[in-house]
C-alpha cells in the first residue's frame, strides 16, 4: 500500500528514468537543424572528429547528444528513416548497460544503431548478437549502409566461415553474429597453437537482440566443443528394446503410500523432466539384462561395474518417455535434429549430451553416432559477463527483470510506444477436451476469414501445427504453415501474413525477426520481385509500383476488419513466449486482438492447475463444448506459469553457481595457456616447474626441520638416478662434511639438473628447444584440461547425493573441484618437467619434427562437434568421480601453488567460495 502511494507521488523507477532520458532527447532534437545543414562528406567527417575528441579524454556520455543527432541525420539520408524520440530513449538505455524492452514493430534494429555508432567511436569493437545467421546477415546488410556512410566498417561472423574472413569480421568496427558463434570463437581461440590464429579481440561492448531468448531461454544449455570418445553405439541399440518390455506406472507414490493409480516398472516425473525405475522395475530390468548377457546372473544394476549400463538404461527410458518426434526433434537425412522449444527452429548440428541423443537415434532407427568427449565448454552467462559493457533489447523482458538484475546486473527499462497500443487481449477460453478446443479454434478462424481479417495461429509444437493444418484443409480454409520443416520459406510466409483473409499457422514466433505489416509487407514482397531473374528491370518497377498502390487499400481493409488476430492454441510455460506471440498484433498503434484457447489436456494445466480448473468446471456444471471464460481461471494459469518460471530460474541459477566454479578455473587455465603462447621464451616457466618438482622429490626424502638421521639419502639418490638420470653424490658429500644443511644438498641437485638441461639446450640451440618446450606445455595443458572437464562433469552428476549425508552439495562441489584443479596443475607440472628433461635429442631437425607432431595431433582433432548441452535438474549420476584424499590434495595444492602463477593473498580464492585466498585454500600453502 505504502509502495503504491510512493509510486503515485514520485512515479515508478521506470517513469523517473524515462523522464531523465527525455531531457537528453530535447538536446538531440535541438541539434537536428545544425546537422541538416552539413553536406554528406561533412556529416561523415563527424565520426573522425568524435574519435579525436574521445582520444583527447572526452567521455562517450559527453559525445552522446551530438553522436545520436549525427546518426539520426545519416539514417534520414541513407535509410529514409528518422529515429523517433522513443528510439532515442532506447539508444540511451542500450548505452547505459541496460535492457530496452520495446514492443514489436517499434524498430529495435534501427534503435540499436544509435548505441552501436556511439560505442564504435572507441575503435575497440562492437558486437551485435542475434539469434540466427539469417538475422545477422540481414541486419548487417541493412544497417551496414548507414554505418558505411558514417565511415565505419561492418563485418558478419557466420558459422562455417573461412578463418581469414572471421578475422576480418572481428577487426571491423561493428561485428554482427550469433550468440553461438561468438561463444564458440572464444573457445576456439583458447585452443590455438599460434597467437596469429586467434580471431577475437578483447571483448568490449555487446548488444544482444532478443536478449531474453539468448540470456534466459538458452542459459541452461552450455556451449560445448567435443571430439569422439569411446565407441558404445552397439550398447544403445541393445538398450533401446528394454523400455518396450517395461510398463509405465500411472501416478507417483506419496509418503503415505497412496497416489499410484496403476503400478508399473517406471514412472515419469513431468515436472522434473525425469524418469525413475520403481523397485519392481529394477528387478525386471536386472532380469532382462541378465538374459541378454549384459550383467552376470544375480548381479545388481547398482554394482560398480554396471553403473554405465544404468546410465544407458535411463537414457533409453527418457528417450522413449519424454522426447517425442515432431515436438522435441525431427528426423531428417538419417539424423535426429533438435527443435528449439522456444522458437520452433531446427537446431542443426546441436546434440543432446549424456548419451540422450544416441538413445533417441536408436529409438528412431537412424545411425547411432559415437558419444563425445568435452574439449572446451562455457555457458552463455559466463561468456557474456566477460564483456566490458553489455546491453540487450527485446519485446518481452519485464517478466524476467529480476533474473536479468540478479544474474547479469542488467536493469530492464520499458520504453514507451511511439503511438498508443490498440490491441485487445481477450480472456482465455478453457475447454474440457482437446477436440472441443480445436473445434472452437477452427470456428474463430473461419469467422475471421469470412470477415477478411488475417489470423496468426500460434502452436507449441510441429505436431500441433500439422494437426491443425489438417483440420483447416478439411474445412477448405486456405492457409500457410510455418514451422521448423518450412524454415526456408519463413521470410516469404511472414511477409504475407498481414494480408486480408490470410491464415498463418506458426510454431513459436519468438525471434522470427520479421514484422507482420497489415496489408502485407511491401518491402519484403518488393525484395522477392527484385530477386526474380526472370523479370526485366521495367517489369520489376511496374510490379513494385502496382504493389505499393494495392497496399494502401489492403491496409485500410485489414484495419477496418480489426487488424491482425492472434489465436494461441496452448499456453507456453513461460508468460514471455505468450506475450511474444500476442506482440505480433497491434504494431505501431495498429488495431489487433488476441485470444488463447486451452484444454484440460494441456501439459501446463495438467501438471500445475488441472485439478483446480476441473473442480471449477464441475461446480459450474459446464455442458459439453462450453468453455470457461473467467478471470479466476486466467489468474490460476498465470500463477502456474510463474511457478514454472521460478523453477526454471532456480535451475539456471544453480547451473550458474556450479559453472562459476569451473569458470574461475577456466580463466586460470586459459590465462596460463595464453602466457605460454605469447611468451618470447618459456624457458623460465619450465625452469620454475622443474625446480618445484625437484623440491617436492627432495622433501619426500629429506623433510624440513628434521635431523640428519631421519633423511633417506640412498632412496633420494636412487630416484634421481632412475627417474631423472642424475648422478649426484649426496651420501659422499655428507660424509666429507663435518655438518651440512639440507639446503646445500638441494642446491647440489638443482645445479646438476640445470647443467644436464643446459647441455640438451646447447646441442640444438635455445630457439629450437624453446619451440619444443612450448609445444610440450600446450599439449600437457590441453590434455589434462580435457580430462579435468570430464572429472568435473562426473563430480557434478553425483554431487547431489551428498545432501543425504547432511552436506551442502554446492560447498562439497567447490571443495572437491578445487582439489581436482590442484591435482590438474600438479599433473601438468610433472608431465612438462618429465618430458622436457628426459627427451633424447639427436638433431635440431628431429626436435622440430617432434614439436610439429605434437601440435598437429592436438590441433587436428577428429570429428569436432559444436553443440548445446542439455542440463536437466536431478540427472541420474553416471559415475561419481573418486574423491582425492585430503592429504594428497593438500600436497597437490602446495605443489601447484609453488609451480604455477601465484594467487595474491588478498585475491578471491579460485575455488569460488567468495573468501579471500589467505582465509581459504591459501592456508594449505
UniProtKB/Swiss-Prot annotation:
Q: What is its main location?
A: membrane
Where found in the cell?
A: Cell inner membrane; Cytoplasm
Membrane topology per record: Peripheral membrane protein
* Residues reported to bind ATP: 87, 105-109, 515
Give the catalysed reaction(s), semicolon-separated. Answer: ATP + H2O + cellular proteinSide 1 = ADP + phosphate + cellular proteinSide 2
Q: What class of enzyme is it?
A: translocase
Q: What start and end residues bound the annotated signal peptide?
A: none
A GO BP entry is: protein transport by the Sec complex
**Cofactor descriptive note:** May bind 1 zinc ion per subunit.
Instruction: Give the protein's cofactors.
Output: Zn(2+)
SMART domains reported for this sequence: SecA_DEAD, SecA_PP_bind
Tell me which EC number(s) this protein carries: 7.4.2.8
According to the UniProt record, one GO cellular component term is: plasma membrane
Q: Which residues bind Zn(2+)?
A: 909, 911, 920-921
Q: Which residues cross the membrane?
A: none
Task: List the GO molecular function terms.
Answer: ATP binding; metal ion binding; protein-exporting ATPase activity
Q: Name one matching Pfam family.
A: SecA_DEAD
Keyword annotations for this protein, in alphabetical order, are: ATP-binding, Cell inner membrane, Cell membrane, Cytoplasm, Membrane, Metal-binding, Nucleotide-binding, Protein transport, Translocase, Translocation, Transport, Zinc
Q: Where does the source fall among the domains of life?
A: Bacteria
Family, similarity comment = Belongs to the SecA family.
Summary of the function given for this chain in its UniProt record: Part of the Sec protein translocase complex. Interacts with the SecYEG preprotein conducting channel. Has a central role in coupling the hydrolysis of ATP to the transfer of proteins into and across the cell membrane, serving both as a receptor for the preprotein-SecB complex and as an ATP-driven molecular motor driving the stepwise translocation of polypeptide chains across the membrane.
How is the subunit organization of this protein annotated in UniProt? Monomer and homodimer. Part of the essential Sec protein translocation apparatus which comprises SecA, SecYEG and auxiliary proteins SecDF-YajC and YidC.
Name of the featured protein = Protein translocase subunit SecA
